Each structure stands twice: as structure tokens, then as C-alpha cells.
Amino acid sequence: MPNYRGGRINEEFKREISNIIQNEIKDPRLTAMISVTDVKVTKDLKYAKVYVSIFSTKEEEKKDNFTALKSASGFIRKILGQRINVRHNPEILFELDDSINYAMHIDELIQKVKDK
């Protein structure tokens, strides 16, 4: 029987981090809608790589939101430590996930081809 612990931990961290970003961070730089698309926690629970999508039309606003997220990583880590009981509280590393923007761009291109 395979061990699904890693997947369960990833999903639990994803749910909690998303909740913290949406409801508990009070940074005025977080103006865009932010979605946690994936979380990958290392097997030794030392690091958690968090992939986020930032929905904004302005590139500078995306950068400001991403910078605000990076600066809030310590706060997020502290709250996670209080909510999730694991041996090590992982260090949070944010990565920008542009896959949703890329998919929207491809969809626009397909629509243009269909219209011709």
C-alpha cells in the first residue's frame, strides 16, 4: 500500500496558506487577487515551495504583491506552526506561477483563429 502522507501534507499546507493569505495578512500592498496553485513540501519538512498566481493587469502591481508575500513569509510560517502539528515548521519559499496567465493567452489565440 503506497504512502500518501506527502500528498496530504501538501494539500493541508496549501489550504492553510491560502486561508492565511486571504484572511489574515493585513498588508496594504496586497491589492490583487492571489491564488495558491500548488505547495510542495520537502520530505524532511524543512522547506515548502508555494506556487502562487497573482491576478492583475499591471506588471508593477504583480511585483508589489509578490514582494509583500515574500515579506510576510515569516508571519505565515508562524501561523502555520500554530495550526499544523508537524515535526518541523518548514521555511516558506514563494514562486510565481504564470501557468494560468499562459493558459488564458493560449485561449485568446485559439479564439482569434476561430474568428478568422
Curated annotation (Swiss-Prot):
InterPro entries in alphabetical order: KH_dom-like_a/b, RbfA, RbfA_dom_sf
**Entry keyword annotation includes Cytoplasm:** yes
An annotated GO cellular component of this protein is: cytosol
GO molecular function terms noted in the UniProt entry: ribosomal small subunit binding
Subcellular localization, as worded in the UniProt entry: Cytoplasm
An individual GO BP term: maturation of SSU-rRNA
What domain of life? Bacteria
> Does the keyword field hold Kinase?
no
SUPFAM superfamilies, from UniProt? Ribosome-binding factor A, RbfA
List keywords of the entry alphabetically.
Cytoplasm, Ribosome biogenesis
Instruction: Please describe the quaternary structure of this protein.
Output: Monomer. Binds 30S ribosomal subunits, but not 50S ribosomal subunits or 70S ribosomes.
Biological role:
One of several proteins that assist in the late maturation steps of the functional core of the 30S ribosomal subunit. Associates with free 30S ribosomal subunits (but not with 30S subunits that are part of 70S ribosomes or polysomes). Required for efficient processing of 16S rRNA. May interact with the 5'-terminal helix region of 16S rRNA.
List the NCBIfam families hit by this protein, alphabetically.
Answer: rbfA (TIGR00082)
Q: Which family does it belong to?
A: Belongs to the RbfA family.
Q: What name appears for this protein in its UniProt entry? A: Ribosome-binding factor A
- Tell me the organism: Clostridium botulinum (strain Eklund 17B / Type B)
